[in-house]
Amino acid sequence: MIDGLPKHKIAVVKFDCLTSSDQEQYRNAGVTAVIGYAGKLCPDHFFVTNVQDAFDWAKGKGFDLLITESAGLCNRCSPHIQGIPAVCVIDNLSGINTPRKLGPVLRLADTVVVTKGDVVSQAEREIFAYNIRLVNPRANILQVNGITGQGAFLLAKNMEKTRSVDTLSGMQLRFTTPSSVCAYCTGERRIGMEYHLGMNKAMEFE
């Protein structure tokens, strides 16, 4: 995709959980990248509290296109920003019903990039795309092959449609981050009702 944006000076900021080898891969591709690790924090809370600094860093370094990538581990979360193009990457090998299990990260995306289509049948690809449409009928679905690069040019052209902004301050997420701040979020490891502090949700069993 980067090759399809020759007129732009691009930077990438990756918000990950514990470890990542992406920085080296970006470097090998000639792309400046910074990786941040959420550690024990919620990855999407980590994203929200650092994305303005990431924007300021890229702007200060003279980049004219910033791509931010989150770990994407929590299907409930959606760190998509209103007014900024949002991309959800999902692969065919995750199962044909997976799109129906995803939350705002897929439902509120502008573009859905589907990978690994070369290792499943045409019927599976079509069912997978159909299930994406059920969740997000307005999204632009792109089939991209990460090995051959097929579809990457169209993705690059999509990225060029983004509008220019001077700051992210004051902008809003498209959906709320999880509100469950509980004792386990802050380091508790013991099991038992007496340790269930903060916001919790109990299941009902017959």
Where on the chain are the PLM-derived regions?
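Nucleotide-state-sensitive switch-loop elements of NTP-binding domains
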Residues: 1-81, 95, 117, 150
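P-loop NTP-binding site
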Residues: 2-7, 166-206
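Conserved beta-strand segments of the P-loop GTPase G domain that flank and frequently precede/overlap
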Residues: 14, 36, 87-92, 113-116, ...
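Short, glycine/polar-rich helix-capping loops at beta-to-alpha or helix-loop-helix junctions
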Residues: 19-23, 97-103, 124-131
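Short, structured coil segments at secondary-structure junctions
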Residues: 29-30, 82-83, 107-108, 135-137
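Short, surface-exposed amphipathic charged segments that create phosphate/polyanion-binding patches used
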Residues: 47-53, 153-163, 183-188
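Inter-motif core of Ras-like GTPase G domains
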Residues: 72-94, 100-110
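Canonical P-loop GTPase G-domain recognition
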Residues: 111, 118-174
